[in-house]
Amino acid sequence: RESVEDPILNEFLTKAIYEEIIPTLSLSSEELETFAKEVIERFKNPFIKHYLMSISLNSMSKYKTRVLPSVLAYLDKNKQLPERTVFALAAYIVFYRGAYNGEKIETKDNQDILDLYADLWKDFDGSKEAITRLVEGILAYESNWDGDLNTIPNMTKQVTDYVEAILNEGMEATIKAINEVK
């Protein structure tokens, strides 16, 4: 609920739904509007309490099944990657570091995913090269993606740029910058 009450996150979510997800769906305009309103109302519902850790369970497979199809459809239709839904992948990558503001975060996922992230983050030094290696490693994990996402035009660069921005500028500043796109 807090996500739609925060003006920055609300703008991000609204733009993601209306500009990146809805245009990839094959429904009537009435059905699309209903879909958008229902998603936003679900987020606003004070009786539905989702905690970040519950939502984050198995995030990589959720991204693959729920978000990646829209990313690919958007790319096919617009010949460019969507900003917000690709940013979501970068945010997951940073989340799977397992730490925030110096505090440990317990991530929950299939063991192979947790092992992959642990291995890729363990020697991370914060350099642009390290960020690129990290992103390439995640995107190349075919067991999760059923293919190598590095082969998608501009995917590696865009995710790398977002991971770098999150790490160097912070999540909120990065989301604000994305909101200013378009």
Where are these regions (language model features)?
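Non-transmembrane, aqueous-exposed alpha-helical and coiled segments at domain scale
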Residues: R1-K182
